[in-house]
Amino acid sequence: GDMAGGFDVLKDVYKSQVYDLASYRNRLEDTPVIPERVITRPPSAELRPDQKDQDSLPDYDTLDAILTLYIDEDMGYQEIIDKGYEAELVAKTIKMVDNSEYKRLQAPIGTKVSHKAFGRERRYPLVNKWSIKG
């Protein structure tokens, strides 16, 4: 799974960037290194049969845009809504980020490529049902 291993190369990369990197890597060779079916297959956490990420998440461009505003730009709930995103989607995204904070503390080390990576640059409480939404 995503949390396996001793070094996480993609730790600090949004999902839409992973797809861009895969496509870029394939353009460097005459024969694709990453099979096209891997890139075009609907994403899934594969936690249950026929599960697709898009069943419970927005498209990755939208999700990554909200995540960028919340994580990288330090915008709050209302500020993100003011950018034109649905309140329910923003609340759900923020809740998913906040509820997964403990997982990031268990993750292996990895490369830092963003303006603000999880870890030393972004630490949030794990207890008391803390949330930035408000």
Where does each model-flagged region fall?
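ATP/NTP-dependent adenylation/nucleotidyl-transfer catalytic domains that generate, transfer
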Residues: G1-G134
